């Protein structure tokens, strides 16, 4: 990854724009072209308007960022060469994680990599 990140053609996609994914997206976008992807269309609309319901980021951080693209269409992340998946893995009362969101996101990214 280090070698790839030193190239000018780096395009990172962060899948899942929650408490982990959104701040990570903003940090990477300080140095690289980044696509923030989330299946929740309303979440993307809110972020594009500068509103973060998690209150992790300010309006300025979201709107004044030329390296950041926010999308909910999986086809818009095809050009990326680095994918980071940051989806929830909630635990049940026995502390067993539900890995279904991670499996689904991995399958989505995998389908793009195969195409």
Feature annotation, model-predicted:
Residues 2-115:
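Structural/interface elements that position substrates and couple domains in central-metabolism enzymes
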């Amino acid at each position: 990854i280090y070698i790839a990140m030193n190239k000018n053609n780096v395009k990172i996609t962060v899948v899942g724009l929650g408490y982990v994914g959104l701040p990570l997206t903003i940090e990477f976008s300080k140095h690289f072209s980044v696509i923030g992807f989330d299946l929740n269309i309303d979440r993307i609309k809110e972020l594009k308007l500068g509103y973060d319901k998690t209150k992790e980021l300010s309006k300025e951080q979201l709107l004044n960022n030329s390296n950041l693209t926010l999308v909910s269409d999986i086809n818009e992340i095809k050009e990326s060469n680095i994918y980071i998946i940051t989806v929830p893995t909630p635990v049940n009362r026995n502390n067993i994680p539900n890995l279904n969101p991670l499996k689904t996101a991995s399958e989505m990214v995998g389908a793009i990599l195969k195409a």
